[in-house]
């Protein structure tokens, strides 16, 4: 059995894969490939057709937006993912970003480093406490719920949620108040977190006049996927101070830089290069799980988390 490993995974997971499969790091002989394990590598219908023996695609992580799921389904190629392996690491990053932009941590560091702070506790570094604020969740999946748990237990936040796939009763059972629209949720929130997959329905979910509903002191975090928050509209909203600040760990063009987004021009924005799952523990869990599940499929068994 031959597995195409498109990107780096945890060394222990690779060793486990190499113990039972032939692992290739190149696409020189696609007709010999039985499985693909990927992180962000794009797999479309053309790739699938070149891999005539392809049986399974394993996603190292959660989001499958780089895989043509309809094409895989039409060709009888199974797709699986690891939906809970990185929950804690991404949730922790979300909490970190919220604290950072609420208290101007990165901004204070940069200004101090550059000699632009002339006295201690300067007024322009005045931030916002997270404790007791209202956290609005756009999407209430595993990651969002874990972030909410940390913030609720640690900071006493009140949690409200928007999720068209979750009933009012189910959301109340989570301890969240449900809102029926994104705009209503934003208007009721001091902190807005985006944790939904990128789909045609969620593309530009937060864009245009939606930014008019933000509280002036609110902060926004997107550690999900680029394209859910419209970056051009976010830039203008931040520049016009329609909200306090924003932080993104996901961008339309990745890795992000000042060359491909003007958001980095702003002092009330911080951006990280999709590092949500980049914790040793999460990488170990994701690697172990995706390897284990792909091997199961190649041995004729059903995976625990099948996407198609």
Task: Annotate each predicted stretch with a short phrase.
Residues 41, 62, 190, 196-198, ...:
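Short glycine-/small-residue-rich Rossmann-like dinucleotide-binding loops
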Residues 52-55, 67-79, 194, 198-240:
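Beta-strand-loop-alpha-helix segment that lines the small-molecule cofactor/substrate pocket
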């Amino acid at each position: 059995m031959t597995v195409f490993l498109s990107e780096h995974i945890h060394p222990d997971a690779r060793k486990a894969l190499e113990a039972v499969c032939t692992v290739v790091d190149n696409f020189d002989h696609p007709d010999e490939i039985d499985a693909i394990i990927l992180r962000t590598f794009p797999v479309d219908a053309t790739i699938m057709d070149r891999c005539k023996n392809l049986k399974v695609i394993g996603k190292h992580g959660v989001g499958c937006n780089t895989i043509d799921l309809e094409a895989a389904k039409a060709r009888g190629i199974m797709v699986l993912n690891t939906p809970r392996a990185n929950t804690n690491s991404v949730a922790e990053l979300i909490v970190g970003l919220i604290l950072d932009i609420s208290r101007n941590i990165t901004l204070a560091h940069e200004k101090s480093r550059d000699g632009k702070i002339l006295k201690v506790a300067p007024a322009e570094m005045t931030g916002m406490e997270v404790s007791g604020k209202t956290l609005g969740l756009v999407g209430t999946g595993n990651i969002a719920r874990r972030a909410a748990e940390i913030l609720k237990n640690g900071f006493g936040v009140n949690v409200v949620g928007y999720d068209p796939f979750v009933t009012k009763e189910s959301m109340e059972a989570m301890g969240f108040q449900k809102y029926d629209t994104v705009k209503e949720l934003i208007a009721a929130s001091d902190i807005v977190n985006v944790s939904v997959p990128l789909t045609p329905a969620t593309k530009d979910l937060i864009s245009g006049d939606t930014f008019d509903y933000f509280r002036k002191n609110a902060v926004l975090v997107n550690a999900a996927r680029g394209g859910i928050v419209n970056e051009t509209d976010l830039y203008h909203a931040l520049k016009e101070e329609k909200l306090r600040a924003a932080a993104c760990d996901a961008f339309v063009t990745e890795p992000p830089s000042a060359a491909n987004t003007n958001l980095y021009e702003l002092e009330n924005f911080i951006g990280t290069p999709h590092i949500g799952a980049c914790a040793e523990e999460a990488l170990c869990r994701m690697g172990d799980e995706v390897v284990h599940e792909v091997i199961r499929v190649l041995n004729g068994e059903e995976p625990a988390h099948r996407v198609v």
